[in-house]
Amino acid sequence: MLKHWRNRAAALGLSLCLVGALCPVAQAVGPEVSAQSAVVLTADTGAVLFEKDGHTPQPVASTTKIMTALLALEAAQEQGDPLVDITQEMVAVEGSSMGLQAGDSISLTGLAAGMLLASGNDAANAAALYLDGSLESFAARMNQRAAALGMEDTHFVTPSGLDGEDAQGLGHLSTAYDMALLARAALEDQAFRQLCSSPSLAVEFAEPVKRVTYTNHNKLLAQYQGCVGVKTGFTKEAGRCLVSAAERDGALLIAVTLNAPNDWQDHTALLDYGFSQVEPYQLAGGDVRLTVPVVGSPVEVVSLRGSNGGEVTLPLGQGAQVERVVHAPKFLYAPVESGEQVGEICWYLEGQLLGSAPLTAAGAAPLQEKAPSLWERLFG
């Protein structure tokens, strides 16, 4: 039905722009937090609601496992969730553990659960070594994904988040803002979201055959209404680190604190503040009605109709700054099918795409039948 609508149009000359007056948005006083760095943003649009030193690179401890678990889950989905045979090299790591032993056999998804609930460094190492053969190669995979997500001030060295340096002397560092970007991407993966939002989870081992129940270290799952994750972390150098997410009235917010002595209290204050600073905004396009001429059809014009693009979460007062752009062709070539997408409606805020919806043909325009030739008229 789509038929590459952009290629069918002679020109997208009817780009209609509808935008409200640009109004300054009053900024409320943000919360006092113990964290050295903190960020709160909306998950759907990425709008920053609060920031404290959010772009300074520093150690992020086990919140690193958000990346490791996401990569493991993606590989599990691609490879049919293979079993990982645990080796001594995989479990030779200090710190928190899911209790793996050499000779165990467990799925990649089971390892991801061990990372996100028990914060297992052994699980992180096992996934890294299984997927890429060495911790260095897996770190390259992590950094490649970080770059793709726009994590400009991040450099990963270890899959677990333990402090370390690579061969070039670069440390394992990220920022509160970058970790929020990572959480935003990870929460779009339903398997990841299910794991990190589970207060506890039973994980099956294939060898030896057993079931082990792990309890999530994230106290906010029980303490904060609507909390859906994400990951705790601590090392002596990083201090207490926490990435959280909570959902309320359709709005999903992400909060990050790094080096926060009172991280639980910080996140309660940050999320409460964030929810007080947002409102839903409907990407309305159902009112769009246009007509365009059709070439090569007995139907001379076709009506086009827009559709709504759903609902997004915006900072208070910024709905007036949303720009709606209607991309419609100057004309169409027959045949045109009813319901066929022939254009697009896009919504932007400060140049960032908030969403899009199809512009479709409200009626059909069949191809003009070829006139019979003289021979066909005489002898047909």
Positions of predicted regions on the chain:
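Hydrophobic alpha-helical segments, especially transmembrane helices
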Residues: 7-9, 66, 248
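C-terminal segment of classical bacterial N-terminal signal peptides
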Residues: 16-27
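Bacterial N-terminal signal peptides that target proteins for export
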Residues: 2-13
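Domain-terminus/edge residues, biased toward the C-terminal soluble/receptor-binding domains
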Residues: 168-380
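Active-site-adjacent loops and short helices of periplasmic peptidoglycan-processing enzymes
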Residues: 26-190
